[in-house]
Swiss-Prot record:
Component of the small ribosomal subunit. The ribosome is a large ribonucleoprotein complex responsible for the synthesis of proteins in the cell. The keyword Plastid does not apply. This is Small ribosomal subunit protein uS7. It is found in: Cytoplasm. One of its GO terms (molecular function) is mRNA binding. One of its GO terms (cellular component) is ribosome. One of its GO terms (biological process) is translation. It comes from Entamoeba histolytica (strain ATCC 30459 / HM-1:IMSS / ABRM). The gene is RPS5. Belongs to the universal ribosomal protein uS7 family.
Amino acid sequence: MAEAVAQPVETVAHTFAPKLFNKWSYDVTVSDISLKELLAINSKLKYQVFLPHTAGRYQIKPFRKIQCPIVERLVCCMMQHGKNSGKKLLAMRVVEESFEIIHLLTEKNPIQVLVDAIINASPREDSTRVGTGGNAKRQAVDVSPLRRINQALYLMTMGCRSAAFRNSKTLAECLADEIVNASKSNTASFAIKKKEDMERVAKSNR
């Protein structure tokens, strides 16, 4: 019988790589340089989790939510609003099922597809009101990288919820369709349509 060979602790720690839901690797690339440090995927080992539930208190300081793994942020967005609020286990099951569907549709790593969808669905330009009262007017402004991620997640989850309402498709199927379409910059995606509307309005207010 062969004897077990002990490995140094450093070697074991270096080779250890968790997988999301014990299936999907975190070995993904972020093509947008401005979002690379804010997506919290593989820049640090603590972002690579088996389950998207870290029980972190990300609300106690501004900008602390950039330390929240991006898949967990998607799960938290799925808990909005109404009857799904607070049901994180349900939201995690929906995201896991949608990732399975994404893998079947694209034969790619679902985390990579999600990252591409966030990059494509995040608006780069928006408009805001400048002035007070009767002198107020709309002014085009650049969108910060953190708000780009927030907007992309919000628009994708809002689109899949509205698509699943009074529809034979499940919420997981609608979420998978939304993410796949957004990753391809397809206008069938609710988030892509909203992003283009926002950028068109901003362009007219330059």
